[in-house]
UniProtKB/Swiss-Prot annotation:
It comes from Saccharomyces cerevisiae (strain ATCC 204508 / S288c) (Baker's yeast). Pfam families: Fungal_trans, Zn_clus. The lineage of its organism: Eukaryota, Fungi, Dikarya, Ascomycota, Saccharomycotina. Residues 20-46 bind DNA. This is Protein RDR1. GO terms for molecular function: DNA-binding transcription factor activity; DNA-binding transcription factor activity, RNA polymerase II-specific; sequence-specific DNA binding; zinc ion binding. The gene is RDR1.
Amino acid sequence: MASPGSTALPHKRQRVRKACVPCRERKRKCNGKSPCEMCVAYGYVCHYIDGRVPSASPQVQQVGETSPDTESRPFVLPGIHRNEQPQPINTQNVTSQNIVDPTKSRYTIQHSAVAFPRCLGLELRSTNPPRLHSFAWHCGIRPEENPNSHVLLSDLVTKEEYYRISKVYFSVVHPIFDVVNPEQLAKNVEKYWDGDVKTLEYGAVIAGVIALGSFFMGSLGHPREMDIVQYAKGILDDPTFSRIPTVEQVSAWVLRTIYLRATSRPHVAWLASCVTIHLSEAIGLHHEIDREDIAISNNVPPKRTTVVSEHTRRLFWCAWSINTILSYDYGRSSVTLNRITCKPVKETDGNFTAHLVALAHLIPQDSVNANAAQLLQALAAVHESPNAHPFLSLTKGDICLSLYRRLRLLNHILDKNVVLQIIDIGNTALSAAYALVKLDQAWWNVLSTSFQYVCVLLAIDTPESLSHVATAMKTLDNITQILGTRIAFEAQKTAKLLLEDSMKKKRQEIQQLEQATHQRSNLETTHLLDIDWDALLDPSDTLNFM
């Protein structure tokens, strides 16, 4: 029945004048476009009886084509190649489209062995095409791993303790690494402590929040923090959950990566960050799920609201930023995805995730073959980026020092202005490190950035850099005394050793210069001793020379 307000425009059934051949054969609704939505979704070759073939339609955006959204981005996303002219959609483009199965959070591409049987069934016009499944992936001789047994998180920490510790997490970690939806977390916490089995996987996220919150409480942290960390690890390693990756797993892996970066060896943290990116790709977080170049398996519409989409973007870009920055600092390869269509995160008050992502994008994409000009350009961009948060100032320091180390390997002679940029970034990072450590916020780079800055000042070895060594060493000493850990004292001892070696080297250089001065003095003395002063000063003796 038409509403009263619709009398002026009576509702009429809209019909398409001509349907494409694939839709006519399958008796499916066609919107008459070229290509139509149905062919785009199922990967059919859209064509019409009148001979029309798919052409570049404004309704279909190919990966690589610019859009108003991409034009307004503050940075260029890596892996996206923009073309100025839209290209016609051909069969090759269609068959290279991606497939997302929302029922299992599974992402793949049509030339994958997992997707090919279904694509073939659709091409053969099967009434019941094969599902998106890894048919014949192995011989099936052995069963899959059995699930692991887990203690209850509620046996390790009470709900009251969770709420107390989570306040620290949301005040310290969440503003920078926005990987947890607070509203969704609050709902799942209540369900988890009520014994809902379905939220067991989400227990890894809850445990990750507790672990990081406890870590940043310092000496007031939870006494069973390590048990909570192991609980989260056990959930993530459980084959029951790892068989089907989810957004919750990615969130939990990001939290675990942050914790490992703050507490464990670099290789372990780097490995966890790589796993996080691979899981993100497995569920298609690096793509916009509503893009028309992504076919939806089983014609199930994606269940992503605007809020959910923004959360998944923040989650993906946080994971990508951690892997990119950590890999660049550690000197390992970051995970490179074939292409990324995920939109950038929006800036919000009190949230610095967008700033972190922007910093990560300043790192040269080809970190191995970047030349001096590219490194200097990146360094200048890092210097110009805002110091919106003390942790971001430290991150700027990490990237800056990483860029310098690569410039040093290229034997590039730094201009005085470049040295001043490094010193400015380093001094700001020093102040941020000392401020954070006094707040008991022991981010990993309060120590590492301070230590590396001392090393870089000694390596630059110019009057401008050496004039800041004393202040940097004093700050490192103060941070070491506050932390009071073995690793802090080890870094302090190493920095002092390098300083002493630098002084020793300069003393040797001075001695070498002094030797040249002594040789000159000895030479002059030798020449003076060869003169017969008595004969020279005796007037009578001068007659012999006349």
